[in-house]
């Protein structure tokens, strides 16, 4: 599954909500955010307190109570974060296999597709992204799991509406 949108449109938050609500073990690979930032987003989603307030301790007693309730809601959710920032697809695929064995994951979130590196001498980024998408699809089939990959849309001042042609560097996955 590819979730694509412009920058700062909520792709990561949507993926976090999906992982929190699926009721199954999920591996979450973030190339941009540390697990503390993702945890703050999870607590924010569960409590209604902004993640910036949580991260920077701008909290009054009412917000602290809401955070406590939010933490209680998400405690024990089987979400396993890999925030090493590795952008090597081989490393991620190996980690997915390990998490399937160790935790019994049923799903994977990859945030985000364009940051991943492929060990191939492809002439262009579009072919590399096609290879990444194919490999993620193959691992999903191999391990009987679902995979959600987040993707940026390229900017198009002529047509700001989201379209398949705006999937940045990913013409082969559309």
Map each language-model feature to its residues.
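Phosphate-binding/switch region of NTP-binding enzymes
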Residues: 127-174
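Cytosolic-facing regulatory segments adjacent to core modules
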Residues: 13, 17, 21-104, 118
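Conserved ATPase-coupling elements of RecA-like P-loop NTPase cores
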Residues: 117-125
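Short hydrophobic/aromatic beta-strand immediately N-terminal to the Walker A/P-loop
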Residues: 1-3, 27
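Conserved Walker B
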Residues: 113
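Conserved glycine(s) of the Walker
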Residues: 10
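The conserved Walker
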Residues: 7
